[in-house]
């Protein structure tokens, strides 16, 4: 059975193994044991309530319970940019006009921005390639919305998600080669790694404070502004079906898009509901629709994916499913359809 739960210290080895499979461009999951161990500790301290808002970050794992192995991760940062500045480029416009010469020209530009400071961030989504099937990807991504809905008071009015930008098969980023390299004089992978391990002072020290003219960039760089890595396209589609949208902000390293939405308007947050548990000694109807189900326990959060038909205010679970969630008959669980009705697969 596949189950999502909060990270534990014993998961470090599995997460380090996952980090070795991400490739270049995923800054929040570097293959660095010390950094990942600290990330786990920060998540544990977040659940224990011992951190300031700007330091809080939740980390969830997708566990194959039969193998007792972590095969995916996803995370939520509670409020970005409250300690270290949060940078991205805002894709904007400058107008150059002259009545004398009868010239009027709109010029696309990139402005260094901290506009998303204080927003909650969906991040660190990675699924072992072996498990990219059976709806595991949407499950691992969207389970965060159930957690946010259940514990709404912990999160900002806005949600953002930085999408991994385009790099080629050799890990080369056209955006970096035409923008970042001119200011940093280091390889994309090195800058990516430094940022991912929290060493971000160099960004403030070296990035330009004035707008960059997009037309001055090579075509290969212009073409990837706001575009995602091919492997990230499914993750982007998942978030867009929930209501997150690209609003003209891109990553300063690879030009990947930032998606955003009002937290309360995200479909899986807004439309999730609570139901009482009934336990039946029968299998869940495989012909039913896919639903995310989660218990309502903050520190012992558990979520699974089931197929069922909803007909009343109760949710029927098998004993195995109830055990995976840590619930008994009469407990309340939160539920949401995995797919929006109009995008059901």
From Swiss-Prot:
**The reaction(s) this protein catalyses:** succinyl-CoA + L-arginine = N(2)-succinyl-L-arginine + CoA + H(+)
Domain of life the protein comes from: Bacteria
Keyword terms: Acyltransferase, Arginine metabolism, Transferase
Q: Where does succinyl-CoA bind?
A: 125
Query: Would the keyword Cytoplasm be found if you checked this record's keyword annotation?
Result: no
Pathway given for this chain reads: Amino-acid degradation; L-arginine degradation via AST pathway; L-glutamate and succinate from L-arginine: step 1/5
EC number, as in UniProt: 2.3.1.109
| UniProt GO MF annotations | arginine N-succinyltransferase activity
Question: Which Gene3D superfamilies does the UniProt record give?
Answer: 2.40.40.20
* Catalytic residues, chain numbering: 229
Q: Which residues form the signal peptide?
A: none
Which InterPro entries would you find in this protein's record?
A: Acyl_CoA_acyltransferase, Arg_succinylTrfase_AstA/AruG, Arginine_N-succinylTrfase
Q: Which Pfam families match?
A: AstA
As for family, the record states: Belongs to the arginine N-succinyltransferase family.
Protein's name in the database: Arginine N-succinyltransferase
| UniProt source species | Yersinia enterocolitica serotype O:8 / biotype 1B (strain NCTC 13174 / 8081)
Provide the taxonomic classification: Bacteria, Pseudomonadati, Pseudomonadota, Gammaproteobacteria, Enterobacterales
């Amino acid at each position: 059975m596949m189950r999502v739960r909060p990270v534990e210290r014993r998961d470090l080895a599995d997460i380090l193994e996952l980090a070795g499979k991400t490739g270049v461009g995923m800054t929040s999951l570097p293959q660095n044991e010390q950094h990942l161990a600290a990330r786990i500790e920060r998540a544990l301290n977040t659940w224990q309530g011992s951190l300031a808002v700007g330091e809080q970050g939740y980390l969830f794992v997708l566990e194959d319970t039969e193998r007792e192995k972590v095969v995916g991760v996803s995370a939520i940062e509670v409020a970005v940019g409250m300690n270290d500045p949060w940078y991205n480029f805002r894709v904007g416009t400058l107008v150059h006009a002259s009545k004398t010469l009868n010239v009027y020209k709109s010029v696309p530009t990139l402005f260094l921005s901290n506009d998303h400071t204080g927003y909650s961030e969906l991040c660190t989504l990675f699924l072992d390639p072996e498990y990219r099937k059976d709806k595991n990807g949407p499950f691992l991504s969207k389970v965060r919305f159930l957690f946010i809905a259940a514990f709404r008071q912990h999160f900002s009015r806005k949600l953002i998600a930085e999408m991994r930008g385009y790099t080629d098969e050799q890990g080369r980023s056209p955006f970096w080669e035409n923008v970042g390299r001119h200011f940093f004089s280091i390889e994309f992978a090195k800058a990516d790694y430094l940022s991912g391990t929290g060493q971000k002072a160099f960004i403030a020290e070296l990035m330009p404070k004035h707008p960059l003219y997009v037309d001055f960039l090579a075509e290969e760089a212009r073409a990837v502004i706001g575009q995602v890595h091919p492997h990230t396209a499914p993750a982007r589609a998942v978030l867009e079906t929930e209501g997150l949208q690209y609003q003209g902000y891109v990553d300063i390293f690879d030009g990947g898009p930032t998606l955003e939405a009002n937290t309360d308007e995200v479909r899986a947050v807004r439309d999730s509901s609570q139901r009482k548990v009934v336990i039946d000694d029968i299998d869940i109807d495989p012909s039913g629709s896919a639903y995310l189900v989660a218990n309502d326990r903050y520190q012992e959060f558990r979520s699974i994916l089931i197929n069922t038909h909803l007909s009343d205010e109760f949710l029927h679970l098998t004993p195995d499913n109830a055990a995976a969630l840590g619930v008994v008959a009469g407990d309340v669980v939160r539920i949401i359809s995995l797919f929006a009705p109009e995008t059901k697969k």
